[in-house]
UniProtKB/Swiss-Prot annotation:
The lineage of its organism: Bacteria, Pseudomonadati, Pseudomonadota, Gammaproteobacteria, Lysobacterales. Belongs to the TRAFAC class translation factor GTPase superfamily. Classic translation factor GTPase family. IF-2 subfamily. One of its GO terms (molecular function) is guanosine tetraphosphate binding. It comes from Xylella fastidiosa (strain Temecula1 / ATCC 700964). Residues 138-185 have a biased composition (Basic and acidic residues). Keywords: Cytoplasm, GTP-binding, Initiation factor, Nucleotide-binding, Protein biosynthesis. One of the essential components for the initiation of protein synthesis. Protects formylmethionyl-tRNA from spontaneous hydrolysis and promotes its binding to the 30S ribosomal subunits. Also involved in the hydrolysis of GTP during the formation of the 70S ribosomal complex. One of its GO terms (cellular component) is cytosol. Residues 391-560 form the tr-type G domain. GTP binds at residues 400-407, 446-450, 500-503. This is Translation initiation factor IF-2. Residues 138-250, 262-298 are annotated as: Disordered. It is found in: Cytoplasm. It holds the Pfam family IF-2. Residues 207-219 have a biased composition (Low complexity).
Length: 892
């Protein structure tokens, strides 16, 4: 670029506006007044340095050589094909592999010495490189020598082992040959003469290497020089010349080759036939045989005797399970039972005696299995609980009739509002809570009061220490009140009566005391031993007196429990949570339940993953009389099941599986009996009884049990409620398919169907109904069942006429002159002719006249003439009934 370059020309060269170039020059510290001024080379370099510094680059003069980059990034892409198994087919997928490597050049100060000349530096580098190459070559040579020595030692070791194996094999063959020779000599001593010349060692080696006696008894052989009449051939064996038949020869050959597979035996037989016999086999074939024998490959061995199995059978067992234990097909087992005169299917159960008989018939042995092995071990675990009993909190169950204020009373004690959250304002689950009061800790169980929850109330009374019977002062004693008294009396639990709702104007506590006298519940003021407390859950009056009464009763009972050791208790309620899995609400009765314990709960087991109390906190452990929620079980246990903590998971699993097997056997026996009862019932009732299939899913186990019992109780002679499946949790796809197959109505109690289940239900038109109150479930099922019953035809008498005289007509025959004594007689309705209150004819009117005029009806106390169609035997004194048929909807 010349020295006469102006700012305008420089702007054109660098493709930059003149104003921007002037700003950049000013930023570099050079002042120019206009675009026509000349820019020198020094000023250009100064501007370039400024721009480099501005953009993060070093200030390097234009004339210097550009430095090599200090960091280089290399990208590489490779395409590969990967074969992926997709079921039975294989799919090839293209995979692109991307690699990125970055190389950083270290500063020159690390490997350059500035004081040395460039030529000396290059020589030193070359010498260093040569030295490193020589060291690498020496290392590689030493490694190759070491590997060669290792290979040589390995080959020598293999050769030594091979020689030892050959020597051992040779010794074994010599021993076998000597033993077989002695056996043959002993067996054939009566019919075979030994040759005077002993067999040579070479002859012995030429014999087959493996000779084994046949399983069956060896037939006697006779000596002969020529082929005998049975087609035998001459064989030389162990120094004896014997004549062996073709059958014996094949059997002996098979006995010598039983250790081989079928393919090897066929190949060896073809080699033997092609070369004229086993004594002329080549050395190569013998070597192959040695290699096959030494490889350890074991072929099928034909059993020499029948296999007798000894199995353990409990009190009952299904036909399929017994066949599996005896390694038989289920069809063969059923066939054997049919031959014994027992008509069963593979799913039916048979008792122990029948299992013994059929097993002995098939050649096997049966012993009685102890069905309580693991239960005994579990009992030993529970009996090992030692410790000093200490006082424990009382467990109090609140019972009473529905809507008498049980949950409201508990809400006031706990300072909560549970009753507001209950559907319909009624309790439908067992609620378990523990409350810290000034008088100590008290555990409360709130039970439902509806009639359908009888089993739930009985379960609450079973595990409680004190029953608080809540009776509304304005309502008095009701059916569930009496039932609660019976539950408490059956469980032997003391009773405290809480007369609630005394704040109402219609309250009459004295009436409650008098009505309970009929149930043998006598108040203390009447000379009895039952405490009566009048209270109001709305105002709180009398609640403290109730807590005092509970504390006094607990002191009298002297409740104690061992708080250390393995925990035992009872399942109060259980459910299936979508996010947490099976959840069981348990009440600890002995010991301490901790996180991480293994426990058996009915037919389920598991490890405690977490503990939750009623407010959602996670305690580390639960002491006696404290209810907690347990997570980690293998399934949803039944409410009322006992739980026990064990040492290891193996015992827990064994006990749970044994209990499940017992329950399964019991269920099969029960179902078989029910099937027979159903068949007999159908035979007796004919086909008039309708069947309503139901599939019930509920949120908790207790509600599910109550629903099933309440709905099955609706069955009668006209309709049968058949519950095909019950379960805890949401309605799934399998539930929907079951409902489609059995044409059942699906009932969801506080649960909903998932997306896949809803799709199946909509496509197939399944009747799905959601409920949250048990009253509504029972009412809706009654309506559906009534719809299945159809209508009933009833006959209603609308009029009665008395025959006063009989006239003869050429057109109608006998015409009865009648007086209507009751109701109305209509021409369009059917009639009956009664004589001495006995029906003698049933038909219809042919003519109804009054004063020779046809009329449609004749009312009470009016005379008329009646012509009966196709009946001429009407007599004076007969009665003619006129009736109509009406349809009436049938209900449960």
């Amino acid at each position: 670029m010349s020295q006469q370059t102006t700012i305008r020309k420089l702007a054109e060269l660098v493709n930059t506006p003149v104003e921007k170039l002037l700003e950049q020059l000013a930023g570099a510290g050079m002042k120019f007044s206009g675009p026509d001024q000349v820019v020198t080379s020094t000023e250009k370099m100064k501007l370039l340095g400024f721009l480099r510094r501005t953009h993060g680059k070093s200030d390097v003069s234009v004339g210097t050589v550009r430095e090599a980059p200090k960091k280089i990034t290399l990208n590489r892409r490779r395409l590969q094909e990967v074969t992926v198994n997709a079921g039975r087919n294989k799919t090839t997928v293209n995979v692109e592999v991307r690699q990125k490597r970055t190389y950083v050049k270290p500063p020159e100060s690390e490997y350059h010495t500035p004081t040395k000349p460039p030529i000396e530096l290059a020589d030193a580098e070359r010498v260093e490189i040569l030295r490193k190459l020589e060291e690498s070559r020496q290392r590689n040579l030493a490694e190759q020598q070491r590997l060669a020595e290792v290979d040589r030692q390995r080959v020598e070791e293999q050769e030594r082992k091979r020689r030892e194996e050959e020597q051992a094999e040779l010794e074994r063959q010599k021993t076998e040959s000597r033993v077989v020779e002695e056996i043959l000599v002993k067996t054939d001593s009566n019919s075979v003469k030994p040759v005077s010349k002993p067999i040579s060692e070479e002859r012995t080696r030429a014999l087959p290497r493996t000779v084994r006696p046949t399983p069956a008894a060896r037939p006697s052989v006779s000596r002969s020089d020529d082929r005998n009449s049975n087609g035998g051939v001459r064989h030389k064996a162990r120094g004896s010349h014997v004549i062996v038949s073709d059958e014996d020869d094949s059997a002996r050959r098979f006995a010598g080759q039983m250790h081989l597979t079928a393919a090897e035996r066929a190949r060896r037989g073809s080699n033997t036939r092609g070369k004229g016999g086993g004594s002329h086999r080549s050395a190569t074939h013998r070597g192959n045989e040695n290699s096959i024998r030494s490889s350890g490959a074991h072929g099928f061995e034909r059993p020499t005797v029948a296999v007798v199995r000894e199995v353990a059978v409990g009190d009952t067992i299904t036909v399929a399970d017994l066949a599996q234990k005896l390694a038989l097909k289920s069809g063969d087992m059923v066939k054997a039972l049919f031959k014994m005169g027992v008509m069963v299917t593979i799913t039916q159960t048979i008792d122990h005696d029948t299992a013994v008989l059929v097993s002995e018939e098939l050649g096997h042995k049966v012993t009685r299995a102890s069905s309580s092995d693991f239960e005994d071990a579990l009992l030993a675990h529970t009996e090992e609980l030692h410790g000093e009993p200490v006082p424990r909190p009382p467990v109090v169950t609140i019972m009473g009739h529905v809507d008498h204020g049980k949950t409201s009373l508990l809400d006031y004690i706990r300072r909560t509002k549970i009753a507001v959250g209950e559907a319909g304002g009624i309790t439908q689950h067992i609620g378990a809570y523990h409350v810290e009061t000034p008088r100590g800790v008290i555990s409360f169980l709130d039970t439902p009061g509806h009639a359908a929850f009888t089993s739930m109330r009985a379960r609450g009374a079973k595990i409680t220490d004190i029953v608080v019977l809540v009776v509304a002062a304005d309502d008095g004693v009701m059916p569930q009140t009496k039932e609660a008294v019976q539950h408490a009396r059956a469980a032997g639990v003391p009773l405290i009566v809480a007369v609630s709702k005394i704040d109402k104007s219609t309250a009459d506590p004295q009436r409650v005391k008098n009505e309970l006298l009929t149930e043998s519940v006598v108040a203390e003021e009447f000379g009895g031993d039952t405490q009566f407390v009048e209270l109001s859950a709305k105002t709180g009056v009398g609640v403290d007196a109730l807590l005092d009464a509970i504390s006094i009763q607990a002191e009298v009972l002297e409740l104690k429990a061992v708080i250390e050791g393995r925990a035992t208790g009872t399942v109060i309620e259980s459910s299936l949570d979508k996010g947490r899995g099976p959840v069981a609400t348990v009440l600890v009765q002995q010991g301490r339940l901790k996180k991480g314990d293994y426990l058996v709960c009915g037919t389920h087991y598991g490890r405690v993953r977490a503990l939750f109390d009623e407010v959602g906190h996670q305690p580390l452990a639960a002491s006696p009389s404290i209810p907690v929620q347990v997570l980690g079980l293998s399934g949803v246990p039944d409410a009322g099941d006992d739980f026990v903590v064990v040492d290891d998971e193996r015992l827990a699993k064994d006990v749970a599986q044994q209990r499940e097997a017992k329950r399964r056997e019991s269920r099969l026996v029960t179902s078989a009996g029910n099937r027979m009862e159903d068949i007999l019932a159908q035979m007796g009732k004919g086909e008039n009884q309708q069947v309503l299939n139901l599939l019930i899913k509920a949120d908790v186990q207790g509600s599910l049990e109550a629903l099933k019992q309440a709905l099955v109780a609706l069955s009668n002679d006209d309709i049968r409620i058949n519950v095909i499946h019950v379960g805890v949790g949401g309605i799934t796809e399998s539930d929907a398919n079951s409902a489609v197959t059995s044409k059942a109505t699906v009932i969801g109690f506080n649960v909903r169907a998932d997306a896949s289940a809803r799709k199946i239900i909509e496509v197939n038109g399944v009747d799905l109904r959601y409920f949250s109150i048990i009253y509504d479930v029972i009412d809706q099922v009654k309506q559906v069942a009534s719809g299945l019953l159809g209508v009933e035809i009833r006959e209603e008498i609308i009029g009665v006429a008395e025959v006063r005289d009989v006239f003869r007509s050429s057109k109608f025959g006998a015409v009865a002159g009648c007086m209507i004594i009751e109701g109305v007689v209509k021409r369009s309705k059917p009639i009956r002719v009664l004589r001495d209150n006995t029906v003698v004819f049933e038909g219809e009117l042919e003519s109804l006249r009054r004063f020779k005029e046809n009329v449609d009806e004749v009312r009470n106390s009016i005379e008329c003439g009646i012509g009966v169609k196709a009946y001429n035997d009407v007599r004076v004194g007969d009665s003619i009934e006129c009736f109509e048929r009406i349809e009436v909807a049938r209900t449960l």
